[in-house]
Each structure stands twice: as structure tokens, then as C-alpha cells.
């Protein structure tokens, strides 16, 4: 049995998609990779990403322009609206999120309020704003860190309610929410959460989570409640059903569904890489998410983004040494962009790299653009000996054929590698 390891560098984009400026015109200039390399204040040491072909996909003076390794390198469009970690990972694993509903909470206040009251909760508007206060302290609101209308949050102070209570409220919201994700968030803040409410883009209103202190005060608890999906038609479940061991690492352990998977949740990059390396020593599928790049993007901290990228690169060097059997695969990609120089703290809608190390291949292949992150999951399925048709979405590169379970994204391009 072979090993396939997918490493998702959260927020690592390689240039704006054509529709990146629909919400914020300035986002057409987004280029997370290039701007981190340009503005980090020093030359970043990224030998593994260079060997994996990042410089072929995104030419830059700071990246190697050739590689001796048998890699396939390209980039992928996101394949879902907006720029969101949850939607990105679900799409990557084979879900079709292309028609996910984008909606502000203001458009569904009556439905959400009625559901919460029916569940026995006290519900009020906060000073007439389109935001709900539940049981006097828990806020149901637009998520201000993603593109408007992609996600809603249910946020509470752990000084006021247990996380189980906050999560229960979020589950009730999820029953009527049309959006991709309802996120239950519990943390510690020194003042009532109403003190940190602000307006966001496109008339959204919500908790300013970074300002609340949730991220810096410790004890943060988060659970993502996604739109209803057939998880049996996603890569982790497909692999597990075939008897292939599955390990989910970092944020992937929190947002992907697979009852049989070993879960290794972690935020520190050193822990994510250690768990990934440990799991990669055994046959099976490993999906790992490095979250700290995304956090640096939200903080608009270019230097921190570069530091984390170097940490990731060091881990990738170890994985390249480890995954040396003919059918092993290391796939490095992203889920969206998060350009720390763009002038705001939101994700950016960018292409992401798709860098595949395949020890059995004869040389380097430059891949055409994939139309969706679902193609990454379909390609990983093929490398594990699985039929990508078992996924709900995605086009796999494969030997002498292309397997499509959704629209063909490559406009008849020949298969780029065996």
C-alpha cells in the first residue's frame, strides 16, 4: 500500500483569479506568494518548495526556476464562491460547493430567531442591528473574517456559557442557515461581546473576533458546522471504505468528516509537521493543514507569514526524503489566498499551487490550470488506487485517461503525467 500526503498551506495563493475584484476591486492585485517573498524583509529559504516546482508555477527571483525532482506543478482555481477554508477543504476532498448560498444574517433574521425561540431560547436584536443576542450573552452574527455572506458565527464568552451551550445554539442555527458554514466560537474576553461588535463589508454586522481577545487570551474553542454534504463521496471516507488508513492533521482534523480517521488537531506549525511526518511513515492517506500562514495573513504580518513558510519548507524537505517509493505522492497546495499586504484582513480569492512529487515519474511536467480544488482530491484518489468517480466532484490526472465526475475543467488538454 502506498502513501499519499496532502499538505495544505492555509492562505497560500499564487495570484488573483479573474473574479477576485468583484467584492473588493483592489484584490485583483492579490499575490500572497509573491508579496510575501517581496516584502518579508529578507530572502526566504525555501528549498523544498523550489524542488517541488513552485518557481515554475510562480516565477520569482527568490524561487528556483528548475528542479531535478520528478514533479508535476500547476495551479488550481478554487472551484467555489469566495475564499474560505471550510469550503476550500470540502471542495478539495470532492464536494461540489460551486453553488453554495451566500447570504447575510440580516436576510434570515426571522427564520433564525424563530428556530432559536422554538428551541427554548430568549432572542433579541442588539440595539436594532441585524445581529441576534441569545440568552443575554451569545451572539449570532455575520462572520467578518471571511467574504461577506459565506459564514455565520455563534460566539460566546466562556465566562458566561460553556462551549457545549454555545455549540447547541449553533446547531439550532445550522438547521435553518443556508450558508456554507456556521461556526461555534467560545473564548475569553474581558468585556461583554457586544462591546466588540462592528460593521463589516457589504452591510454585514458581527463580532470583531480579533479585537475581542479570543485569539490571544487562550482557551479558544471552535467547531465548524458545515452545510449538509454526502461525506461518503469525499476522499477520506472513500479511502477508509477501501481499507486505507486515514489521518487528518491540524485544522483538517476539525473540518473534515471521516469516522474512521485518526485525528491529530493542532495549530502550532511544529506540531502539525511532527504529526504529519509520523503519519507519513505508514501507508495510507494523510491530509494536513498548516493554519499559521493563514493567521499571519489575517494579522497582515508579512514577516510572520515568511517565518511560517520556512518552517513548512523544512518539514516538506523531510517528507520528500521519506516519500520515496514509486507510488508515493506528496501533494502541496492551498485553499485560498490571504495576502498580508493587500490592505485588509480578509482572505483573497487567488489561484493556489498544486505541486506533486511522484518518485516513479520520468521528469518534470507543467500542468494546465485546474478548474477546481476538487481536482486535487481526485488526483490523490487515483494515486491511492481508488476510482475518482466515487467522489462527488473533481477531475483526476491519470495514466492515458482523465476521469471526470464533474465538468471537465481542462478543455481537452492531454494528460500531463503518468
Where are these regions (language model features)?
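Feature captures the catalytic ectodomains and active-site-proximal regions of enzymes
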Residues: 1-418
